[in-house]
Amino acid sequence: MEPDLHDQQQQQRVHSVVIITLPPSDDPSQGKTISAFTLTDHDYPLEIPPEDNPNPSFQPDPLHRNQQSRLLFSDLSMNSPRLVLGLLGISLLAVAFYASVFPNSVQMFRVSPDERNRDDDDNLRETASFVFPVYHKLRAREFHERILEEDLGLENENFVESMDLELVNPVKVNDVLSTSAGSIDSSTTIFPVGGNVYPDGLYYTRILVGKPEDGQYYHLDIDTGSELTWIQCDAPCTSCAKGANQLYKPRKDNLVRSSEAFCVEVQRNQLTEHCENCHQCDYEIEYADHSYSMGVLTKDKFHLKLHNGSLAESDIVFGCGYDQQGLLLNTLLKTDGILGLSRAKISLPSQLASRGIISNVVGHCLASDLNGEGYIFMGSDLVPSHGMTWVPMLHDSRLDAYQMQVTKMSYGQGMLSLDGENGRVGKVLFDTGSSYTYFPNQAYSQLVTSLQEVSGLELTRDDSDETLPICWRAKTNFPFSSLSDVKKFFRPITLQIGSKWLIISRKLLIQPEDYLIISNKGNVCLGILDGSSVHDGSTIILGDISMRGHLIVYDNVKRRIGWMKSDCVRPREIDHNVPFFQG
């Protein structure tokens, strides 16, 4: 007598396999997949009673499929309870591990795809991101050729024609905000710029300013420590350097009146009294080296390329600098002014954010090698979703700079003093406007003492080299060609942020190549200077030299600062099929 189907199922021994596949670490948005299989010891065919009235077009009710699944799981649970518990335990551990590694992706699993796509579309319509690539400083002819070939993809004879096409049909900001989410997300932006730590001592980007019919490109020194963007102008000019481009010519109807909010913002820290009835808004900014810029506030259109290649324009308030004095004039031989990127309301990112064009997030990535490229961006789209080290941003009502708190600082295994409150807590200020890094006096003296050990190796002090205060030459008198020749003699500097317990703190590691340079004489020089007379004298100023080779992000929305190691060739979030840098 043949056993019926129920008896067969009772006699079969059921096995199960559960496969959990996690997404790749570089693309957690693909989600996880869970596959379950059941196997039996005997090959009994599954017999399904025929329907009385079969209908070929009939689609099975999802409820029936769920009941079938519950039946199979019920049979399995009755026959192999230990196996079920074991599989459930493994599944829970896998899900918990995934949630800890990719919390954002797990949160995305909780909403439907339609809701998630709708939210993404809304967010993309609200803000966009701008990217400003940073290249090594080139000679004028090479720089001009790279602009033509890389940014415009054209030969020299087509340069004028391409500029006309680019300026005649700009996309208004309002049009950009109504652009489809897909086009914004797939676009890129490239502005040819130049700079290095040594010998130029600055990094700058190129921005188009003015109306479409008479717009002019200006090279601006990127400065996260400055609030005001300003350009040398003919108002007329009292003291101006030659600059990289012709002087900006302001229009009278573009001048900012003293009664406007931005004027009050700029003049709040100035010694001169605010004049509400004046027809113009005067400014005077003094920098750490005691050089200064004086001028008036004006307003004009800034043109910024979005990811999709379209050109957005927005009216931006900036300074028309007609009187520059001090060492500032030296940098203005290569640039036309300063691009203020601080937290201040009048900074460029803050103005764009107040108009809803971007999220108030600024990031920069300066490559480590001498011929390196890099970029800066405004907006949150290019902030990596993982791999960043984040620390709280210090809030200082008196200073709109990007600062964090540091609890320990060391050179190798030796501790360096912090000149903060009671010497226990110090502050670090991120400043792309400083070529080099500055330590408080006590920490600097301790570092110099610790570095005396390198003179006993293959190096000896060379006081004849005036590139920087401290330089060493090889005892063989053979000039060094790169930092790879000498970095083995030096030790890393570690900044510990947060708790003093190492296991729960964050660290910023400054490798020897992040604080040394090779001078024109072939010597190695210390790129950390005495900061006794810089800022308040007790703050660590992190300059360009120590930020190279890192992506550093200032998130003013979440009030945090983050960093990660990077080659700075291109933003991680930009599609590799989209040209970003050439050559």
Curated annotation (Swiss-Prot):
Molecular function via GO: aspartic-type endopeptidase activity
- Highest taxon, organism lineage: Eukaryota
Q: Where in the cell is it found?
A: Membrane
Q: Where is the Peptidase A1 domain?
A: 203-564
Q: What stretches pass through the bilayer?
A: 83-103
What UniProt keywords are attached to this protein's entry? Aspartyl protease, Hydrolase, Membrane, Protease, Transmembrane, Transmembrane helix
Q: Without the gene, what phenotype results?
A: Enhanced susceptibility to B.cinerea and permissive fungal growth.
Any one Gene Ontology BP term = proteolysis
Q: Which PROSITE patterns match?
A: ASP_PROTEASE (PS00141), PEPTIDASE_A1 (PS51767)
Q: Name one Pfam family in it.
A: TAXi_N
Q: What is its EC number?
A: 3.4.23.-
Q: Which cysteines are disulphide-bonded?
A: none
Effect upon mutating residue 223 to A:
Loss of protease activity
The task this protein performs is described as:
Involved in proteolytic processing of BAG6 and plant basal immunity.
Family per similarity comment: Belongs to the peptidase A1 family.
Q: How does the record describe its quaternary structure? A: Interacts with BAG6 and BAGP1.
Name by which UniProt lists this protein = Aspartyl protease APCB1
Organism for this UniProt entry: Arabidopsis thaliana
Q: What broad taxonomic lineage does this protein's source fall under?
A: Eukaryota, Viridiplantae, Streptophyta, Embryophyta, Tracheophyta
